[in-house]
Amino acid sequence: MTYLLDVNALLAWEHGNSPHHAVFHAWARQVGRANLWTCAHTELGFLRVSMQVVGYSLAQATAALAELKQHTGGFVATAPSPRLPAWASAAAKTSDAYLTQVARANKLRLATHDAGIKDGVVELIGPAKS
């Protein structure tokens, strides 16, 4: 199985102070980093939040993203024009809905810590299964 990481998954990967940091790393070991993908939308979100919330400079955020990308399996280079489902009727849900569309269009699962995204393409990142 191959996964598109959402913004919070990328943040959990990089930032040790994320409440999901340990869970993400355990999950990533289980599924294999070669199966983890990014896209322009999630990478831009990672840069924005790393700078705005974490306090990284642009150079620090860019370097952190470049380091993460060395350990991923791929990058979704083409993204469809948004065709959002009805459940994305609130502005706060548009990015999540778009990422489900990108994942589906590229035959990926959307990996997230957000249990509120109710879509069949979503894979909730949880504790590693033994």
Model-predicted segments: where are they?
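Short, well-structured N-terminal submotif of metal-dependent ribonuclease cores
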Residues: 1-38, 53-63, 129-130
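Alpha-helix capping/helix-boundary segments
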Residues: 9, 42, 98, 116-117
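Structured helix-beta-strand junction loops
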Residues: 31-34, 71-72, 105-106, 120
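Short, conserved alpha-helical segments within structured domains
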Residues: 38-43, 95
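Active-site neighborhoods of divalent-metal-dependent phosphate/nucleic-acid chemistry enzymes
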Residues: 70-115
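Active-site regions of enzymes building and remodeling cell-envelope glycoconjugates
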Residues: 120-130
